[in-house]
């Protein structure tokens, strides 16, 4: 289910909302307004990782915090002039990045949704 508006994106769940300026750092923006990105549609790039062919070029970020939620690690990562929520599978302690760690993010472009303005 994709949100149709900013209100719906905030109501439905933990979507990251990107402005046109923030989104243009990731892909060629066609619309004005906001873009919604689910936390699981953003990947922390790992050496040797395999990612969908629809991913963006890497975007630099810095880990602000992390929260262990069972089989998911929820990160707050500063990137693109905002703090993004990024969810990754908790497969091992080696995947746990400490605050202030520099990371590279990949956005699944097929899952970035423009919102009605």
Locations of regions flagged by a protein language model:
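Conserved beta-strand-loop-alpha-helix hinge in the C-terminal portion
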Residues: 1-12
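Non-catalytic connector elements of ABC transporters
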Residues: 15-17, 25-117
């Amino acid at each position: 289910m994709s949100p149709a508006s900013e209100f719906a994106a905030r109501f439905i769940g933990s979507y990251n909302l990107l402005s046109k300026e923030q989104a243009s750092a990731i892909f060629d923006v066609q619309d004005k307004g906001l873009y919604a990105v689910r936390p699981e549609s953003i990947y922390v790039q790992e050496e040797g990782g395999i990612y969908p062919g629809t991913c963006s070029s890497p975007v630099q970020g810095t880990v602000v915090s992390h929260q262990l939620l069972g089989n998911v690690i929820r990160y707050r990562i500063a990137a693109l002039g905002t703090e993004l929520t990024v969810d990754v599978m908790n497969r091992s302690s080696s995947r746990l990045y400490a605050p202030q760690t520099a990371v590279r993010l990949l956005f699944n472009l097929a899952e970035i949704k423009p919102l009605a303005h």
